From Swiss-Prot:
ATP binds at S21, G22, G23, A24, D25, S26. The N-terminal region contains the highly conserved SGGXDS motif, predicted to be a P-loop motif involved in ATP binding. The lineage of its organism: Bacteria, Pseudomonadati, Pseudomonadota, Alphaproteobacteria, Acetobacterales. It comes from the Bacteria. InterPro entries: Rossmann-like_a/b/a_fold (IPR014729), TilS/TtcA_N (IPR011063), tRNA_Ile_lys_synt (IPR012094), tRNA_Ile_lys_synt_N (IPR012795). Keywords: ATP-binding, Cytoplasm, Ligase, Nucleotide-binding, tRNA processing. It comes from Gluconobacter oxydans (strain 621H) (Gluconobacter suboxydans). Ligates lysine onto the cytidine present at position 34 of the AUA codon-specific tRNA(Ile) that contains the anticodon CAU, in an ATP-dependent manner. Cytidine is converted to lysidine, thus changing the amino acid specificity of the tRNA from methionine to isoleucine. It is found in: Cytoplasm. One of its GO terms (molecular function) is ATP binding. Its main location: cytoplasm. This is tRNA(Ile)-lysidine synthase. GO terms for biological process: tRNA modification. Pfam families: ATP_bind_3. GO terms for cellular component: cytoplasm. The gene is tilS.
Length: 398
């Protein structure tokens, strides 16, 4: 585990989180993690997708207790049908991140194994992915406020099951893991040993290429791009290319994924426009280039104003005293009292900044500089909290 570190001390206030479904792989992870350190906490997610899921989740919590592993049950709210596996995965990680933060976990261990890696790479190979996709699942990545660590990526699932059998530890078999309606299940059942070996070669070659490309991109962004704490970016004309636009659009939007390549190429041909909730426009007084700002129409809805609340998936409100019933939403027309030229903030970017509203009136604006709000409103501390980097997501993957 040392190579995945650094790790916090093994104390009550800094446990390491475990994502445990109750299946063989995650139960093996829990067993091994508990042998590694005393302070771990398992999070068991009930997706509520099957009638028996609640009972299975409770059984898993009981089994973890028998392994001397502290466990918390997380039950997801119902979500719309369609793209069920994708929606369930997204909702699961949202719940896991929030649970980790509440328990003081900086790291969450996830039980992806060698077979998962093979299937992921082969699936992306079939869909003609480039180095970004073919580099596969990374052993360490960052999601929001936590690290996701996958220490079992080089271990076959058969070895994990043998570990459980040797310790007389039971697990749950999820019937959806055998449902051939899902592409991943078909690959899991149909991939030959030769194809799995080819997938591993593809993954290693793509990983090296991805690292090289990311290093080049980071150098180019360092030379031509400027990130501003108000959530917008200036990109000099010499730095405008497909890769730079793609990662910067993702950065400004806070999206988990880059926009589609074809859409980025179309945007480059136009020279300006909107994509993935981001406006790309000429920089004007800010220099020779373009600026990228959040698209106002794409902003998230108001959320209750409380310490730690995240609005639009990007801005987190720190501790502050607000009236009961206050909400976090965009500044919008409230920016009329601001001297945007003096503050150096584009009009479109300022409208999309967060503020605290109460009964239709802005009571707290973001802290932008001396006398930004005058007597119009107080100030609140918002921090950028999307957890989406421009580059470097894969710097743990060597």
């Amino acid at each position: 585990m040392a190579r995945f570190g650094p790790w916090p001390p093994d104390i009550d206030d800094a446990p390491v989180g475990l994502a445990v479904s109750g299946g063989a792989d995650s139960m093996a992870l829990a067993f091994l993690a508990r042998r590694w350190r005393r302070n771990v906490v398992a999070f068991v997610v009930d997706h509520a997708l099957r009638p028996e899921s609640a009972a299975e989740a409770q059984l898993t919590v009981h089994r973890l207790a028998g392994m001397n592993v502290k466990a918390r049950l997380l039950t997801l709210a119902p979500f719309p049908k369609g793209r069920m596996q994708e929606r369930a995965r997204h909702a699961r990680f949202e719940a896991l991140e929030a649970a980790c933060v509440s328990e003081g976990c900086l790291d969450l261990l996830v039980a992806h194994h060698a077979g998962d890696q093979d299937e992921t790479v082969w699936m992306r190979h079939l869909h003609a992915s480039g180095p970004l996709g073919l580099s596969g699942i990374q052993p360490v990545s960052v999601r929001g406020r936590i690290r996701l660590v996958r220490p079992l990526l080089t271990f076959p699932t058969a070895r994990l099951r043998l570990t459980l059998q040797a310790e007389n530890l039971p697990w749950i078999e999820d019937p959806s893991n055998a449902n051939r309606r899902f592409e991943r299940v078909r690959l899991r059942q149909d991939l030959t040993p030769e194809q799995r070996q080819e997938a591993r070669v593809l993954q290693q070659d793509a990983l090296q290429e991805r690292l090289r490309l990311e290093a080049e991109l980071a150098e180019e962004l360092g030379r031509h791009a400027v990130w501003y704490s108000q959530g917008w970016v200036f990109l000099g004309q010499e730095g405008v290319d497909e890769e730079a636009l793609s990662v910067l659009i993702r950065l400004v939007s806070g999206s988990a994924y880059r926009p589609a390549r074809e859409a980025v190429r179309t945007l480059m041909t136009q020279g300006y426009g909107t994509l993935s909730g981001v406006q790309v426009r000429p920089a004007g007084r800010f220099g020779n280039g373009i600026i990228l700002v959040r698209e106002e129409r794409a902003l998230g809805p108001f959320v209750p104003a409380k310490a730690g609340a995240v609005w639009d998936g990007r801005w987190r409100l720190l501790a502050c005293d607000v009236p009961q019933g206050s909400l976090i939403g965009s500044l919008g027309d409230a920016i009329h009292v601001m001297d945007l030229r003096r503050l150096g903030v584009p009009y479109a970017a300022a409208r999309c900044l967060p503020g605290v509203w109460h009964e239709g009136r802005l009571v707290l604006g973001p802290r932008l500089g001396e006398r930004a709000w005058g007597e119009f409103a107080g100030e609140a501390d918002f921090v950028w909290s999307s957890g989406v980097p421009a580059t470097g997501e894969n710097h743990f993957g060597t």
